[in-house]
């Protein structure tokens, strides 16, 4: 208990808005690293993501997308340090919001500077996805970003709480105001919206499919996202441990996590582990993959553990209570963002293996790609 109190005291040095900002900056660094690792493994990631190709496709330093991601990572780090310094010096978290706001303005500002074209494409992608749609010729990057939003769903919901704290809190920011100002209904609706986006995208994909097989798999994919809704909303009412609603909540979480894990491995990563798990022949890949089977097995195990992180709720009450504290919630959000970053890397790797999107070290191309203008 003393350790938990110490951790909660430590997290109070980082107000909620900075914890959320940290997760955004971490995601940017992770994406930059993903691009780097894919490029050094000869994956034509910039073509897969429909971004302008650099002159030398094997050098990510020339790619505008990599340059923007890396620059935003550095900028985010500097603004985070400034925001934290302002918070520690002033003792008020209002000033900490200013650098975070500046970061958002820089990302979306309609100024022809700082990789304007890439930011414009990203802004239009955000507007398109928030409307629950995607461009058929831009499907892969849209789906990647939409799935990324599902892992940031609780982070996005906490933005509402951060806004409420900014508006209503007048006392010491060192106190946790989560229980006082969080609205579970509103925050659950916000958290569910990214899943609703993917659910609608799957229905659109199903309606436009040309054959029954594509319709079938699109239907199964839509069911995966639909199973997230009970896991989100039942938590509002399942307050009493071992009640019927509590068991129903955990059951729905188990169904969603297991289904999503199977889809991650079998469909998104195109791994054959679940065809006949006891047959070693089915653990061999029929197409080019970047890593040996053991690597994929380890990553799949990590994905399973992180998908099942919700089981902390069934721990003894004195242990599960830690994950309802500010520090515990932050750790769970961080682990989910980390899991999604790993998923993104291997999702792009799987797409490259299916489409043979690899480049030769001497391959040079200045052919532009189509963007959703």
Swiss-Prot record:
Boundaries of every EXS domain copy: 178-373
Record bears the keyword Glycoprotein: no
Superkingdom to which the source organism belongs: Eukaryota
Cited PROSITE patterns: EXS
Biological processes per GO annotation: protein transport; retrograde vesicle-mediated transport, Golgi to endoplasmic reticulum
GO cellular component: endoplasmic reticulum membrane; Golgi membrane; trans-Golgi network; vacuolar membrane
Protein name (record): Protein ERD1 homolog 1
Organism for this UniProt entry: Schizosaccharomyces pombe (strain 972 / ATCC 24843)
